[in-house]
């Protein structure tokens, strides 16, 4: 969706950009596919803070998205393209010919009235979902499973696409948006095409309050805290850190690697992602 700016009639409007929502065809969601979504504000089931800088924001309902795409050989008509406040991509409402309704991630180029289908015999067409073993090498994919039948976990955000690079034995090699080359089982399902809403990356928040609408709270630097609040804090005026950068709890930060050296999925990674 194209992005529009504003005349600078206030400091907050000067840099702000918003989506024009031209692709959105329906503004009220399908009630049968909504679920309540309680605000966690970064707390776990014990009420303890586990993720900082979260809280507040507009109240939301969760849209139940079909990430498995396992309703085989039943064609579905795209009834509408809708906004989803819980993700960067838009979603498409499908009406299956047997009366079932479902939401899927809206791929780039998907139009209202278009027919999509899932299953091993599906055509290589945008919006269709099928096992990777039935997809030709070089195809752009999104909504990719990591384990057969578990549901899609990879390449789900706006504008994302992976390319099928090779198929050998039981595994296929994908090039992910990060540049990582990764193997997945050929029985895993993927959807043809690129995730829509390509211009999402060009949106400028513009002002602090808009971040608060999204449930994002301020990030305070440790250097401006008191020494009892952060290892970087204290001192008269501005000071260098004076030690290796650390988190509020004293663990290495700012470039320290956090991935486990013996992560179970290491054997599926052919090439690590490059530095940005």
Swiss-Prot record:
Entry similarity comment: Belongs to the universal ribosomal protein uL2 family.
GO CC annotation, single: large ribosomal subunit
GO terms for MF: rRNA binding; structural constituent of ribosome; transferase activity
Protein species of origin: Desulfitobacterium hafniense (strain Y51)
Name of this chain's protein: Large ribosomal subunit protein uL2
Keywords per UniProt: Ribonucleoprotein, Ribosomal protein, RNA-binding, rRNA-binding
Taxonomic placement: Bacteria, Bacillati, Bacillota, Clostridia, Eubacteriales
The keyword RNA-binding appears for this protein: yes
PANTHER family reported in the protein's UniProt record: LARGE RIBOSOMAL SUBUNIT PROTEIN UL2M, RIBOSOMAL PROTEIN L2
Description of how the protein assembles with itself and partners: Part of the 50S ribosomal subunit. Forms a bridge to the 30S subunit in the 70S ribosome.
InterPro entries: NA-bd_OB-fold (IPR012340), Rib_uL2_dom2 (IPR014722), Ribosomal_uL2 (IPR002171), Ribosomal_uL2_bac/org-type (IPR005880), Ribosomal_uL2_C (IPR022669), Ribosomal_uL2_CS (IPR022671), Ribosomal_uL2_dom3 (IPR014726), Ribosomal_uL2_RNA-bd_dom (IPR022666)
Gene name linked to the record: rplB
Function of the protein: One of the primary rRNA binding proteins. Required for association of the 30S and 50S subunits to form the 70S ribosome, for tRNA binding and peptide bond formation. It has been suggested to have peptidyltransferase activity; this is somewhat controversial. Makes several contacts with the 16S rRNA in the 70S ribosome.
Biased composition regions of type Basic residues, renumbered to the chain: 257-276
Annotated stretches, region: Disordered: 225-276
Superkingdom in the source lineage: Bacteria
Any one GO biological process: cytoplasmic translation
UniProt keyword Cell cycle, yes or no: no
């Amino acid at each position: 969706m194209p992005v529009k700016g504003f005349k600078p009639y206030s400091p907050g409007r000067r840099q702000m950009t918003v989506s024009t929502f031209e692709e959105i065809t329906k503004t009220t969601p399908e009630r049968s596919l909504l679920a309540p979504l309680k605000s966690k504000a970064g707390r776990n089931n014990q009420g303890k803070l586990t993720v900082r800088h979260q809280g507040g924001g507009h109240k939301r309902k969760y849209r139940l998205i079909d990430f498995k795409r396992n309703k085989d050989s039943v064609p579905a008509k795209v009834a509408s393209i809708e906004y989803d406040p819980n993700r960067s991509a838009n979603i498409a409402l499908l009406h299956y010919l047997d009366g079932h309704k479902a939401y899927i991630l809206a791929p780039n180029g998907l139009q209202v009235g278009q027919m999509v289908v899932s299953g091993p015999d599906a055509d290589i067409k945008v919006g269709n979902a099928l096992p990777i073993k039935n997809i030709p090498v070089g195809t752009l994919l999104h909504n990719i499973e990591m384990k057969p039948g578990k549901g899609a976990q990879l390449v789900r955000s706006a504008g994302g696409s992976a390319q099928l690079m090779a198929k050998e034995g039981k595994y296929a090699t994908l090039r992910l948006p990060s540049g990582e080359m990764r193997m997945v089982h050929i029985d895993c399902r993927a959807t043809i095409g690129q995730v829509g809403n390509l211009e999402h990356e060009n949106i400028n928040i513009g002002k602090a309050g808009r971040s608060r609408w999204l449930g994002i709270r301020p990030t305070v630097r440790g250097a401006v805290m008191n020494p009892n609040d952060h290892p970087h804090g204290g001192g008269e005026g501005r000071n260098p850190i004076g030690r290796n950068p650390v988190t509020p709890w004293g663990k290495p930060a700012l470039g320290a690697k956090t991935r486990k050296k013996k992560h179970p999925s290491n054997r599926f990674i052919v090439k690590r992602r490059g530095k940005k």
